[in-house]
């Protein structure tokens, strides 16, 4: 069996490592560097350049040089409109997905990622002297299902079987905790070029267990570069009355200067930015020359630093720990070299951050360790990761019913039994969701599939078992089975889309912000379900036994049913309105069942069943075991 290499496929830079003699080793590329820029360029001659050589020619070829492709991977075109504004190359729609227009053709984000992976694969093959076909690849902890699948696809394009996708902070913890004998509670604060993650873990004696994770897939070093770039454009416009925003070559030079200034300000109090011949007008060439102090830089980027603190708060809350209980805060990612970030982390957790690991290499090292575990070369190391967002399906009333909660250890498998919402319903539509909001429409749709051939039966009778199976890569498989007929259908959620920045925020952050609204909607949906079920049961009672009941009582019940139906037709009816209609109808239905009981005598059996039926939605929602609930499935023709 060949080596399983470890790759950190980063937004800005990537890195490859292997296990050698029981120890992880970062490999040096052809240029003699331990990291490779995640940049791919296409030349007029038809050549494809990858890494440092591609980055070097970006100023003269900005429209055909692709960087930060990781921000686009696994996402639909409609979701990346903000990102498009930040890059000099052209992003186009390709069906629902996005692609880059380069030299008259298109390249997908997966293809760009594959080009970087292929270069790192060759670095490993050159070092080992043998073919490499398997890898462990890391992704941001907050990558959703589609983005993970797209990353696996990039590996396949590069000729690599991705044996495992693991979260970047988890990989860093694996590298950090590999030799730790004493149990420690640690925070991995991972601030990379394009993404931010924070994970809280327990490490010790070969076990790395994730307690909680959170993050922002659109917060990274790129954002700091953009702040400096926009400041330079504004300053130049003030001095020269020339706007550089539409000059792609100038923008590329400004981007490189901004990145260089950011790096220099990590060790210096001030930096000089000097770009001769940045542009020209009728009076001749124009030069950009200015100075930027660390104090000014900190002031301009203060909001970005603060943005990273909110995921830290949420991860701590989810883990059940206090900041004082954390033993170490390990800094990962190149952006953690920024002094303002180090200070914010120290202030938040109340301790000096741990800088014992190389922030650019530790993730690849952890991936290599996991590769060694999978290959059997590394013993006594156990990795217990989690899924970052809750997973579930849409049920009656447009509610999301969660099957797998966020921060559940993976791999994980969970089944729940649902039923139909209409009589003789022949099929159900399984709507798979990811997110933290109560209502299905506020969460991310991962996919849909149909289970057909359900035998005719009254609503609530068919038993449909839905199973969610999330594998060790964090990729979801969903199946549905009709328990009576044995018919089943399953789906592997594929990379149909990713989440926009707004969607990711809504997934968890907005859940708190809209807590009251979500609560009202969920309560109204519950009351609607109860009333709808009681209407059904009352109509059935009148149909089956109406002849034995007083005409006046039946008339009153029918009027209450009509009133309830009218309220149900009002999609904006409040929970109180629905509850009031339920109580009025329930009182009348109780009278009917009492009359029926008197007429039939105190015989057990049917009378008890009628009484049960008359209890309506609340009774039926809670009877039959906790695993059986009515599901809102529509007939699919």
From Swiss-Prot:
Keywords, alphabetical: ATP-binding, Chaperone, Nucleotide-binding, Phosphoprotein, Stress response
Does the keyword section mention Amino-acid biosynthesis? no
Among the GO molecular function terms of this UniProt record, one is: ATP binding
Where is the region Disordered? 596-637
- Can you list the disulfide-bonded cysteine pairs? none
Q: Give one Pfam hit by family name.
A: HSP70
Species name: Bdellovibrio bacteriovorus (strain ATCC 15356 / DSM 50701 / NCIMB 9529 / HD100)
Its name, as the record gives it, is Chaperone protein DnaK
Instruction: Reply yes or no: does the keyword Phosphoprotein apply.
Output: yes
Indicate, by first and last residue, each region the UniProt record lists as having compositional bias (Low complexity).
600-621
Which residue ranges run through the membrane?
Answer: none
Q: Which family does it belong to?
A: Belongs to the heat shock protein 70 family.
Q: What induces it?
A: By stress conditions e.g. heat shock.
Residues bearing Phosphothreonine are 195
UniProt cross-references to SUPFAM superfamilies, sorted A to Z: Actin-like ATPase domain, Heat shock protein 70kD (HSP70), C-terminal subdomain, Heat shock protein 70kD (HSP70), peptide-binding domain
Q: What does this protein do?
A: Acts as a chaperone.
Xref: HAMAP family: DnaK (MF_00332)
């Amino acid at each position: 069996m060949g080596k399983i290499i470890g790759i950190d496929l980063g937004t800005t830079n990537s890195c490859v490592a292997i296990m050698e003699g029981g120890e992880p080793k970062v490999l040096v590329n052809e240029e003699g560097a331990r990291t490779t820029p995640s940049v791919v360029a296409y030349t007029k001659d038809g050549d494809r350049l990858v890494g440092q050589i591609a980055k070097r020619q970006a100023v003269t070829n900005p429209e055909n040089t692709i960087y930060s492709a990781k921000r686009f991977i696994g996402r639909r075109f409609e979701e990346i409109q903000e990102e498009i504004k930040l890059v000099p190359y052209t992003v186009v729609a390709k069906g629902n997905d996005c692609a880059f227009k380069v030299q008259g053709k298109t390249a997908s984000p997966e293809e760009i990622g594959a080009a970087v992976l292929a270069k790192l694969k060759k670095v490993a093959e050159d070092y080992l002297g043998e073919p490499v076909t398997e890898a462990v690849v890391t992704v941001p902890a907050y990558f959703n299902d589609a983005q993970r699948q797209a990353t696996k696809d990039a590996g396949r394009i590069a000729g690599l079987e991705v044996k495992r996708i693991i979260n970047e902070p988890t990989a860093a913890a694996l590298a950090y905790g590999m030799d730790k004998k004493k149990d420690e509670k640690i925070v991995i604060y991972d601030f990379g070029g394009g993404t931010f993650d924070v994970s809280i873990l327990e490490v010790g004696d070969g076990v790395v267990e994730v307690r909680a994770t959170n993050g922002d897939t659109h917060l990274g070093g790129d954002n700091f570069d953009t702040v400096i770039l926009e400041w330079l454009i504004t300053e130049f416009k003030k001095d020269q009355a020339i706007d550089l925003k539409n000059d792609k070559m100038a923008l590329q030079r400004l981007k490189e200067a901004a990145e260089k200034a950011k790096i220099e300000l990590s060790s210096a109090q001030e930096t000089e930015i000097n770009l001769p011949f940045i542009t020209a007008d009728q009076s001749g060439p124009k030069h950009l020359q200015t100075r930027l102090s660390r104090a000014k830089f900190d002031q301009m980027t203060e909001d970005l630093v603060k943005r990273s603190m909110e995921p830290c708060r949420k991860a701590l809350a989810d883990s059940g720990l206090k900041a004082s209980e954390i033993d170490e805060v390990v800094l990962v990612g190149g952006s953690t070299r920024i002094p303002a970030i180090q200070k914010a982390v120290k202030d938040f957790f109340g301790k000096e951050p741990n800088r014992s690991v190389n922030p650019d290499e530790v993730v690849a090292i952890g991936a290599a360790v996991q590769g060694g575990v999978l290959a059997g070369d590394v013993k006594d190391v156990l990795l217990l990761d989690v899924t970052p967002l809750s997973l579930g399906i849409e049920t009656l009333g447009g509610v999301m019913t969660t099957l797998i909660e966020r921060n559940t250890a993976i791999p994980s498998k969970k089944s729940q039994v649902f039923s139909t919402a209409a009589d003789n319903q022949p099929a159900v539509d399984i709507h798979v969701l990811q997110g933290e909001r109560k209502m299905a429409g506020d969460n991310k749709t991962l996919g849909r599939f149909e289970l057909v051939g359900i035998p005719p039966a009254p609503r609530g009778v068919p038993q449909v078992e839905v199973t969610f199976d999330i594998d060790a890569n964090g990729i979801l498989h969903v199946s549905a089975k009709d328990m009576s007929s044995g018919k089943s259908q399953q789906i592997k959620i594929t990379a149909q889309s990713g989440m926009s920045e707004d969607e990711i925020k809504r997934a968890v952050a907005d859940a708190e912000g809209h807590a009251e609204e979500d609560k009202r909607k969920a309560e109204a949906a519950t009351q609607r379900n109860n009333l709808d079920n009681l209407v059904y049961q009352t109509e059935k009672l009148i149909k089956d036994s109406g002849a034995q009941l007083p005409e006046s009582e039946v008339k009153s019940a029918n009027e209450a049913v009509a009133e309830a139906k009218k309220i149900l037709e009002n999609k904006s009816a409040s929970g109180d309105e629905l509850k009031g209609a339920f109580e009025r109808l329930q009182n009348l239905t109780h009278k009917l069942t009492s009359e029926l009981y008197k007429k039939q005598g105190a015989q057990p059996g049917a009378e008890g069943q009628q009484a049960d039926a008359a209890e309506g939605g609340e009774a039926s929602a809670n009877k039959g075991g906790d695993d059986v609930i009515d599901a809102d499935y529509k007939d699919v023709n």
